[in-house]
Amino acid sequence: MWIYSPPKRPKSKVPEDVKAAVTKQAEHLLEAWRPRHIKPPTPGYQFNYIVELCGTWFRSYFYLCAKYACPGPTALSPFFEARFARLEYVGDRRFNLAFMRHTGQWVELEQGLTIDQCFTSLREESFYQPA
């Protein structure tokens, strides 16, 4: 059966000043999180552990990522990167905030937030923090 599917509305392009403001606030947040989330492994530790926290832009999304080390002898690669939080630019200097669920699906909890509101939620809510 065929049905009409209207064209999707184009995503808002992120202005450079907004990108710079988000990147700056993210770096401050990640600096505060690094001592708490990046710990040296104990000798003989065989499980994945966080070695770096970073942020990156892709189209109209800003992702917070954790780089994990894989020390075990059966590891497929020595490192991998996992995204754990996402800010989606929706226009008018507003963002939707989502976290990565253990199933690999993004769960959007908050919509239409300002940059300051986004980073307040990131600081306060454990959903958005690396595991």
Spans of features found by a protein language model:
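Negatively charged, low-complexity tracts enriched in Asp/Glu with abundant Ser/Thr
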Residues: 2-72
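Short, charged/polar micro-motifs that form catalytic or ligand-binding hotspots
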Residues: 16, 77, 105-108
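Short, conserved beta-strand/beta-arch hydrophobic-aromatic motifs that form part
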Residues: 62-95
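Short, compact, well-ordered microdomains
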Residues: 86-131
